[in-house]
Amino acid sequence: MRTLIAVLGFAALLDAADAPPPVVYMDAAKVAEALAKTGLITTNSEFMVAGAHREKPGQVELHEKTTDILFVVEGEALYVTGGKMIDGKQTRPGEWIGTNIEGGVEHHLKKGDVIVVPANTPHWFKEVTLCNSFMVRVNKP
């Protein structure tokens, strides 16, 4: 839990600007619910915090103006970052999906791990049987 607090604190430091957004509190039951089915915890124009539940691989993603921070709380996954996105298609401004990554780095994520994926970095849950994580997205202006 201390690691999660550190991750959220890091996200807040990245976001230090004018007036702070309101404090958001969610009790343990709602956090568990968010983790069980991929649910939003809080969001505003500067950041988003969600519980992410995965039982299968995903698509390659790239966010031009968003840094993703993941804190794994259960399970494991093979997560690929960097390299070149293959068959990239823009889904909306600044957001891309693809089918594969060429030349990326593989990370074996497990409980307790944190990974920070800077904006403009392809990333991909390549192999997953179960991986629950907190995801913090920090938006660049």
Q: Model-predicted segments: where are they?
A:
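Structured binding elements
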Residues: 70
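A short, N-terminal "cap"/entry segment at the start of jelly-roll beta-barrel domains
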Residues: 13-65
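Ligand-binding loop in jelly-roll beta-barrel domains
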Residues: 108-113, 119-141
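Sec-dependent N-terminal signal peptides
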Residues: 3-13
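Short acidic-glycine-tyrosine-enriched beta hairpin
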Residues: 84, 89-119
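Short beta-strand segments in beta-sandwich/barrel cores
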Residues: 76-79
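Short histidine
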Residues: 56, 93, 123
